[in-house]
Amino acid sequence: MSSNSYQVSIPMSKRNTNGLPGSSSNELKTSAGGAVLSFHDICYRVKVKSGFLFCRKTVEKEILTNINGIMKPGLNAILGPTGGGKSSLLDVLAARKDPHGLSGDVLINGAPRPANFKCNSGYVVQDDVVMGTLTVRENLQFSAALRLPTTMTNHEKNERINMVIQELGLDKVADSKVGTQFIRGVSGGERKRTSIAMELITDPSILFLDEPTTGLDSSTANAVLLLLKRMSKQGRTIIFSIHQPRYSIFKLFDSLTLLASGRLMFHGPAREALGYFASIGYNCEPYNNPADFFLDVINGDSSAVVLSRADRDEGAQEPEEPPEKDTPLIDKLAAFYTNSSFFKDTKVELDQFSGGRKKKKSSVYKEVTYTTSFCHQLRWISRRSFKNLLGNPQASVAQIIVTIILGLVIGAIFYDLKNDPSGIQNRAGVLFFLTTNQCFSSVSAVELLVVEKKLFIHEYISGYYRVSSYFFGKLLSDLLPMRMLPSIIFTCITYFLLGLKPAVGSFFIMMFTLMMVAYSASSMALAIAAGQSVVSVATLLMTISFVFMMIFSGLLVNLKTVVPWLSWLQYFSIPRYGFSALQYNEFLGQNFCPGLNVTTNNTCSFAICTGAEYLENQGISLSAWGLWQNHVALACMMVIFLTIAYLKLLLLKKYS
């Protein structure tokens, strides 16, 4: 595979005199002339399941049918009604559609798309996926650090960032936070421009946008399209889907592709679309928006655009082999286009590129080569996650405050535990609460992967980082500190207020045990949450799991009395291991019958007077292994759950 054949973006490996990335002469020829994207006989089918559980049927649904066309440098709009297939076509062209059920060819300058096409091209999703707790500049720095080659110096990368900020008119808000639901940030238009800027960091020659005007008012939407028009004049091929643009936006289009029910209604110069529809008998009324007119024609819901048969015979040019009268409207329009001069001209031009279809193809969907190393990605992901943590006081500061308050409340309720029979119950109760509190506090870890799912999928597909870099980066910067710090605070507050065993070793064993419980529970939360799209579903599954685990923790029921066919469930209980370790740490060596000789006084034969007796009654071994086996079990569960979470992320469906 030669680099010249597959060049679709300005390369970053060389530098010119101004410090910005440069190119060789042959590569510049491709970049300067712009990238021409052609698509040949694109068909896309999906299998849809319907019916009830035992009567489910799988039906194959055709999303796109024999789509052909060419996208040249300029503004290339894909227009159509809801469900017409415009977003599907955009994803197919951008190599972001599930390859199963997909047929046809997409060529760049007559050559197959390279394996790293998704990294070389830019793709702006419909829902802006940027880190809201970071500033505009910090988001761009993250994109530059992971997508630009390491051969570029930090000074060159900063120059590139400043150039993009200036090009998109983000100078005034460059150091303002993008904003979240809790943090006031930039406007909707500035947020959309930030998303575009993230993709322009690599200076791609092809830029895809999925409905860039969604959620914007008419004035802001017009400003965004004017920006795209200005960018297209620099030689970029900009391809975007759009639903119903106003006329001031429509007149900016260079090329127009009309889709309905996955069929091609028109593909050609936007300025000639009205003339084409007039030639087949559909005239646009004066002062009517052409985009609205096209949708009215496709949907067949406007009698104003349909001429009478007499008028059509007099004024309209009949295409070759017109469809029958009883043919559905979509089929009629598709047949009209197939027999039009626009389609024939497109086929002639497509034949000039079809030579690349005969070449040996390289899969677009195989693993790409990243421009940065694992450690470099890990460092930047950890840095961004830590900034995001500090920028979310509701998730970080609030959790610490709640931990302090809860520790003080528990310390007040169980203050200064006595070494008497009541002390046994109180100790068991408070240790059980500490264990279960660590479990339920870890439910918040489900948001770690669910909230950022769309961001992760977009950045991973775009070649920002590896799955392993993202996973371990989140663990280092978010999971570890947010589970370790509360455990330390909780232990320091409650241990001395409760008056637990006055031994330094016991203090640190309790702290370590609470940390292990928190890590194991959080790992379980990640294993459940990975791949989930809704936080409430993952939270519900976590809560139900912990409720069952609590039953087998050792407090609510004596585990020695559980029937054999259910007793095996205790080995899957995180609270059981934490509770057993805390009991061993606290009860061993304690005497709860002060003043009595437990070896000679028969009054204690039916009572528990020592911690050792209590532990034996609970089925806890008095050997040193009786303590550390719980930590080993928690560590094994943590490794297993983290492995499951990583595999679920790795196998997550990353195509739309």
Curated annotation (Swiss-Prot):
<comment type="subunit">
    <text>Homodimer; disulfide-linked. The minimal functional unit is a homodimer, but the major oligomeric form in plasma membrane is a homotetramer with possibility of higher order oligomerization up to homododecamers.</text>
</comment>
<dbReference type="InterPro" id="IPR013525">
    <property type="entry name" value="ABC2_TM"/>
</dbReference>
<feature type="binding site">
    <location>
        <begin position="80"/>
        <end position="87"/>
    </location>
    <ligand>
        <name>ATP</name>
    </ligand>
</feature>
<feature type="disulfide bond">
    <location>
        <begin position="593"/>
        <end position="609"/>
    </location>
</feature>
<feature type="transmembrane region" description="Helical">
    <location>
        <begin position="632"/>
        <end position="652"/>
    </location>
</feature>
<feature type="topological domain" description="Extracellular">
    <location>
        <begin position="499"/>
        <end position="507"/>
    </location>
</feature>
<dbReference type="GO" id="GO:0031966">
    <property type="term" value="C:mitochondrial membrane"/>
</dbReference>
<dbReference type="GO" id="GO:0015562">
    <property type="term" value="F:efflux transmembrane transporter activity"/>
</dbReference>
<feature type="transmembrane region" description="Helical">
    <location>
        <begin position="537"/>
        <end position="557"/>
    </location>
</feature>
<dbReference type="GO" id="GO:0015878">
    <property type="term" value="P:biotin transport"/>
</dbReference>
<feature type="binding site">
    <location>
        <position position="243"/>
    </location>
    <ligand>
        <name>ATP</name>
    </ligand>
</feature>
<keyword id="KW-0813">Transport</keyword>
<dbReference type="GO" id="GO:0097744">
    <property type="term" value="P:renal urate salt excretion"/>
</dbReference>
<keyword id="KW-1003">Cell membrane</keyword>
<keyword id="KW-0445">Lipid transport</keyword>
<dbReference type="GO" id="GO:0008559">
    <property type="term" value="F:ABC-type xenobiotic transporter activity"/>
</dbReference>
<protein>
    <recommendedName>
        <fullName>Broad substrate specificity ATP-binding cassette transporter ABCG2</fullName>
        <ecNumber>7.6.2.2</ecNumber>
    </recommendedName>
</protein>
<feature type="topological domain" description="Cytoplasmic">
    <location>
        <begin position="653"/>
        <end position="656"/>
    </location>
</feature>
<feature type="topological domain" description="Extracellular">
    <location>
        <begin position="558"/>
        <end position="631"/>
    </location>
</feature>
<dbReference type="GO" id="GO:0005886">
    <property type="term" value="C:plasma membrane"/>
</dbReference>
<feature type="domain" description="ABC transporter">
    <location>
        <begin position="37"/>
        <end position="286"/>
    </location>
</feature>
<dbReference type="InterPro" id="IPR003593">
    <property type="entry name" value="AAA+_ATPase"/>
</dbReference>
<feature type="region of interest" description="Disordered">
    <location>
        <begin position="1"/>
        <end position="25"/>
    </location>
</feature>
<dbReference type="InterPro" id="IPR043926">
    <property type="entry name" value="ABCG_dom"/>
</dbReference>
<comment type="function">
    <text>Broad substrate specificity ATP-dependent transporter of the ATP-binding cassette (ABC) family that actively extrudes a wide variety of physiological compounds, dietary toxins and xenobiotics from cells. Involved in porphyrin homeostasis, mediating the export of protoporphyrin IX (PPIX) from both mitochondria to cytosol and cytosol to extracellular space, it also functions in the cellular export of heme. Also mediates the efflux of sphingosine-1-P from cells. Acts as a urate exporter functioning in both renal and extrarenal urate excretion.</text>
</comment>
<keyword id="KW-0812">Transmembrane</keyword>
<dbReference type="GO" id="GO:0045121">
    <property type="term" value="C:membrane raft"/>
</dbReference>
<feature type="domain" description="ABC transmembrane type-2">
    <location>
        <begin position="390"/>
        <end position="652"/>
    </location>
</feature>
<dbReference type="GO" id="GO:0031526">
    <property type="term" value="C:brush border membrane"/>
</dbReference>
<keyword id="KW-0067">ATP-binding</keyword>
<feature type="transmembrane region" description="Helical">
    <location>
        <begin position="479"/>
        <end position="498"/>
    </location>
</feature>
<feature type="topological domain" description="Extracellular">
    <location>
        <begin position="416"/>
        <end position="429"/>
    </location>
</feature>
<feature type="glycosylation site" description="N-linked (GlcNAc...) asparagine">
    <location>
        <position position="597"/>
    </location>
</feature>
<dbReference type="GO" id="GO:0016887">
    <property type="term" value="F:ATP hydrolysis activity"/>
</dbReference>
<feature type="transmembrane region" description="Helical">
    <location>
        <begin position="430"/>
        <end position="450"/>
    </location>
</feature>
<dbReference type="Pfam" id="PF01061">
    <property type="entry name" value="ABC2_membrane"/>
</dbReference>
<keyword id="KW-0547">Nucleotide-binding</keyword>
<dbReference type="GO" id="GO:0015143">
    <property type="term" value="F:urate transmembrane transporter activity"/>
</dbReference>
<keyword id="KW-1133">Transmembrane helix</keyword>
<comment type="similarity">
    <text>Belongs to the ABC transporter superfamily. ABCG family. Eye pigment precursor importer (TC 3.A.1.204) subfamily.</text>
</comment>
<keyword id="KW-0325">Glycoprotein</keyword>
<dbReference type="Pfam" id="PF19055">
    <property type="entry name" value="ABC2_membrane_7"/>
</dbReference>
